[in-house]
Amino acid sequence: MRATLFSFQEAALADLHEKIQKAHTLWSEKDPQVISFTAPTGAGKTIIMTALFEDIIFGHAYGIAEPDSIFVWLSDMPELNEQTRLKIESKSDKFRARDIHIIDSNYDSEYFAPGGIYFLNTQKLGTDKLLTQKSDLRQYTIWETLANTAKRQPKSFYIVIDEAHRGTATPQAENRAQSIMQKFIKGSKEDGMPIMPLVIGVTATPQRFQRLVADTTSTIQKVAVPP
């Protein structure tokens, strides 16, 4: 990391590692895992998550390196993903630009490549969008890519739902984004999308993320930075 974490950020990072290890121990297809990571605005959530990604991929005091791990960062606006991507690139001294990918409408792969961070936004995931439809030019939908990767490596595939930097949108647009985000938490039979094995929700207000995970069958663990 190019940035030095404050003590409260280090404490949150250690807690995230502990909860992830616990989630991996508890995980089964019938018991998917969710971690709710809450921190107030300005607490450096993206910096903490960048340190977490580095630790998992490159090794850390809490465990050995897992270089095949994959992270998918989901938000509701492409501009927010771009801001987060730039922050990760500026704060990390280990990830290179080639390791960080913005998923566009042309993306088509059976699996996500190991060792990468992938940014995805809900605006590209509607039923009428190219990423979600098969065609003569597309072999795999994004739902199939997610499902295949989760099945192949359930304990090294991380979905990060960015609730902390939600864009300003109409109620209708916000409801659509929430419905799409819930597919990662609850699965979607019509899309062939299973429940993702481990979802980390990054939020400034726990109530907002709680609405996303309401009625889920997942085990929910909590990490919180005090205000």
PLM features: what roles do these ranges have?
Residues 3-31, 121:
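N-terminal pre-P-loop "Q-motif" helix
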Residues 22-32, 58-71, 92-105, 175-176, ...:
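Flexible phosphate/Mg2+-sensing switch loops adjacent to catalytic phosphate-binding sites
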Residues 27-52:
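Walker A/P-loop
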Residues 31, 67-68, 112-113, 152-155, ...:
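Short loop/turn elements that form and flank the Walker-type P-loop nucleotide-binding site
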Residues 42, 76, 204-205:
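Conserved H-loop
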Residues 46-51, 62-96, 121-127:
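Conserved Walker A/P-loop ATP-binding site and its immediately adjacent core
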Residues 49-55, 86, 119-227:
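Signature of the SF2 helicase/ATPase Hel1-core->accessory helical subdomain module
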Residues 106-118:
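Conserved motor-coupling elements within RecA-like helicase/translocase cores
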